[in-house]
Amino acid sequence: MMSKSQTTTDPDWLHNSHAGELLVSEFMDPIGLTDETLAASLGIAPARLRAVIAGEQPMDADLDLRLARYFRMSEGFFLGLQLDFELMEAKRALNGELDRILPRAA
């Protein structure tokens, strides 16, 4: 049976926040942390951090580990945000194509 739900495939459903956007809104802005200060604390170039914040580059394992250590978060937390973003973007790009794939019966 094909799903009639457009919840996850409708491009206008919800704003899909990139990991860098969430890094700023949930971690940096609340404590007044600048990208320059955070980059220096992480031991990375500010341009690298800015590219992730701008959504121009994806979060990677190296940056995830540095951020997790700095913010005392679980390793993989920031990669999880990136994965959630990429999955939603892929669903939107497929735009209903997944509905045409019949799940294999057990």
Predicted features by range, described:
Residues 32-51:
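Short alpha-helical DNA-recognition segment
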Residues 68-84:
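K/E-rich alpha-helical interaction surfaces of small helical-bundle regulatory domains
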Residues 45, 56, 71, 85:
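The DNA-recognition helices of helix-turn-helix-type DNA-binding domains
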Residues 1-26, 30-31, 96, 100-102:
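N-terminal flexible/basic segments that precede or flank functional cores
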Residues 56-69:
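Short, basic-rich loop-to-helix N-cap that marks the start of a DNA-contacting helix
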Residues 79-106:
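Short, charged recognition helix plus adjacent turn
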Residues 28, 39, 68:
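The alpha-helix within a helix-turn-helix
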